[in-house]
Regions:
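Alpha-helical interface subdomain recognition
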Residues: 1-80, 84, 89-91, 101-106, ...
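A short, Trp-centered hydrophobic/proline-enriched beta-strand micro-motif
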Residues: 117-125
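Flexible, small-/acidic-enriched active-site or ligand-binding loops
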Residues: 136-138, 191-220
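A short core secondary-structure module
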Residues: 147, 151-195
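Residues immediately within or flanking Cys/His clusters that coordinate Zn2+
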Residues: 410, 426
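Short, cysteine/histidine-rich loop/knuckle motifs that typically chelate Zn2+
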Residues: 414-415, 429-431
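Cys/His-coordinated zinc-binding microdomains
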Residues: 417-419, 433-436
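Short metal-binding segments enriched for Cys and/or His
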Residues: 438-443
Length: 443
């Protein structure tokens, strides 16, 4: 039985997140985008309000949120500012490898630290020449007894300049692809860790993005998140559980753009009436609303699958690329409704459009998601319909054409579908001219 009714706990969290977004994030969103800074005081407020670290399991003292709670929270925060919401959410991304890790002592040690004080943790996989291709990691982890020595550079790291801890993915052998990938929990203050300059971005400027360099950084065996051979799977499992939240970012951003466009269309007059009365505008609004709703349903389904212990990989990929592309389309159409004013910084649409563009890139590009989904559809998905060459003949032929042919063998051309009756197939198909070898006995 399907049930889309949120629980009282979930509704309470949704309301709390919405109130925080409208009161604390929305009034400062434009300012921090303009100055390209991340407000630590805002993050501390979110932490104090219980909107950060909610996904730490209850057995370690956390709230034990499921993914449904995470996507509800993310949508509301992103509606106010995608960039600042990214900064808040990325703590969950950085923490997910620790949640999924098999290293129990490490979990107990760092979860207690994160819950006790205001601590941030970032996710460090991407490199200057590597993004979605996690198996191509070049950051080297060399064995030093039972410990490891890290050398290399990470790039595009959200919260890289402000995080206290880092979930770092490296490899013991760059040529071994996914088999050499491993992961470690690294502290910012360890010797050899240095933070690069903040990367200037087109959008989501309220989120801190930097490079991180590791030079002979010694990582004790106690801080291994995943040993060599298990790091790649840990990264994939992390993405499967966090991609629904990227979809939720897109839903929140798209929802805001749509709401602003509706409000403007009801007030802007042209040719003697509000532009909301024009069918062209109404059709744009209808398509916006349709895409927001379908995106949210996909995001919720992916989150629900994860919460049920199912593998959400495919649904998460679908939700990620559908919702993020829909978001960009909605923001673009919203700007069109605003016309010239949408292109100015006096209204929020231009910022939402800049912010929305990033969703199609991070945590796996749209192209990578399509590759994942197409591979599943063509190689794993089990079709219900029979192959074309095995379709029942009587379903596709005029019954009158079957008269007098009872008992004869039916031969179907696998190229064009033509059916021939006789003891043997024809030497050549009269339609597509393929030879006898193209024919197969039909059921």
């Amino acid at each position: 039985m399907l049930d889309f009714q949120l629980s009282p706990r979930q509704l309470k969290l949704q309301k709390k997140a919405r109130e925080f977004a409208l009161k604390e994030i929305l009034p400062v969103a434009w300012y921090y985008d303009e100055i390209d800074e991340t407000p630590l005081n805002l993050l501390k407020k979110a932490h104090a309000a219980g909107l950060i670290n909610g996904d730490i399991p209850k057995k370690y003292g956390g709230k034990g949120w499921g993914l449904i709670e995470s996507v509800l929270l993310t949508e509301e925060l992103a509606a106010a500012c995608p960039g600042l919401a990214t900064t808040i959410f990325d703590n969950s991304l950085g923490m997910e490898p620790l949640v999924l890790s098999k290293n129990e002592p490490l979990k107990k040690k760092y979860f207690s630290k994160i819950l006790k004080d205001f601590k941030l943790i970032c996710f460090a996989t991407s490199e200057p020449t590597m993004g979605s291709d996690v198996a191509a990691i070049r950051c080297k982890a060399e064995r030093d007894g039972n410990d490891y020595i890290l050398n290399g550079t990470k790039y595009w790291i959200t919260n890289g300049g402000i995080a206290d801890y880092m979930s770092v993915f490296a490899t013991v052998d760059p040529d071994s692809q996914h088999e050499g990938v491993c992961a470690f929990l690294v502290e910012k203050d360890w010797k050899g860790v240095s933070i690069g300059r903040k990367i200037p971005k087109m959008g989501q400027r309220g989120s801190n993005t930097t490079g991180i360099n590791f030079k002979d950084v010694k990582v004790p065996k106690e801080n291994i998140l995943a040993p060599p051979g298990e790091g790649f799977m840990l990264a994939m499992q992390t993405f499967s559980r966090t991609r629904p939240a990227i979809g939720a970012f897109a839903v929140g951003t798209a929802r805001s753009a749509m709401e602003y466009a509706i409000d403007y269309a009801k007030k802007r007059r042209a040719f003697g009436t509000e532009i909301a009365n024009f069918q062209a505008i109404q059709h744009k609004i209808a398509e916006m609303y349709q895409k927001v709703e379908t995106s949210r349903l996909l995001v919720w389904k992916a989150a629900w699958e994860a919460d049920q212990g199912m593998d959400p990989t495919i649904t998460a990929s679908i939700a990620k690329f559908y919702s993020t592309e829909a978001c960009l389309e909605i923001a673009n159409e919203a700007l069109q409704i605003f016309a010239g004013y949408g292109y100015t910084k006096m209204f929020p649409i231009e910022k939402l459009l800049r912010d929305a563009r990033l969703f199609r890139i991070y945590e796996g590009t749209s192209e990578v998601q399509r590759y994942i989904v197409s591979g599943y559809a063509m190689n794993v998905y089990q079709p219900v319909m029979p192959p074309l060459e095995d379709l029942p003949i009587h379903r596709e032929m005029d019954p009158t054409e079957l008269e007098g042919k009872e008992g004869q063998t039916a031969w179907r051309c696998r190229i064009c579908g033509y059916v021939h009756y006789g003891e043997t197939p024809p030497e050549e198909c009269p339609y597509c001219f393929f030879p006898e070898s193209a024919f197969k006995e039909a059921p």
